[in-house]
């Protein structure tokens, strides 16, 4: 009887040892697979980041909104905008950007002796400057830019041949303009992204500085590779 009990205990101990060993081996295998999966995921993300931000060129375009002061004593008016840009990157972070913008709106001239209300105005800017991309992730990136150039103001296009100055508007002329802002990109693919750009535009029509704020939206296409 004693021998039978001893045999049962030995068998139970052996079975427990087998189960513990099997469970430990299974846990080790799961941990190894999880570690390998995490490593593969990190490697994939790094490859995507490399593929996305090793492009040498970016071309973009879209539309937006600008809050603009059209005369020294006039209220600010809302304008719709378009933008086209091209950027050449020397490395994944530093590049130079050239940009064309246009803005269209109706000036708030109030009551005048000419019986003209809210004449149409437009401005076109041509600027270039450095662009620095300081945040790069698999799907998102943020860059900042500073540009300077020339702005063409057309403030008498809707004034029915009345000089813009007589309506309280800036004179139609070409003046210096400058801008700073941030590009916030969301990448659908390594070569295609949606862009949101909060921006400041400084203009100097009439010999004074106008501080204008706006936001642009659009798409960006990336191509070529940095050598």
Where are these regions (language model features)?
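Residues that define the transmembrane beta-barrel architecture of outer-membrane proteins
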Residues: 55, 76-82, 120-126, 172-178, ...
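C-terminal segment of classical bacterial N-terminal signal peptides
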Residues: 18-27
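Short glycine/proline- and aromatic-enriched beta-strand/turn motifs that initiate or cap beta-hairpins
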Residues: 27-87, 224
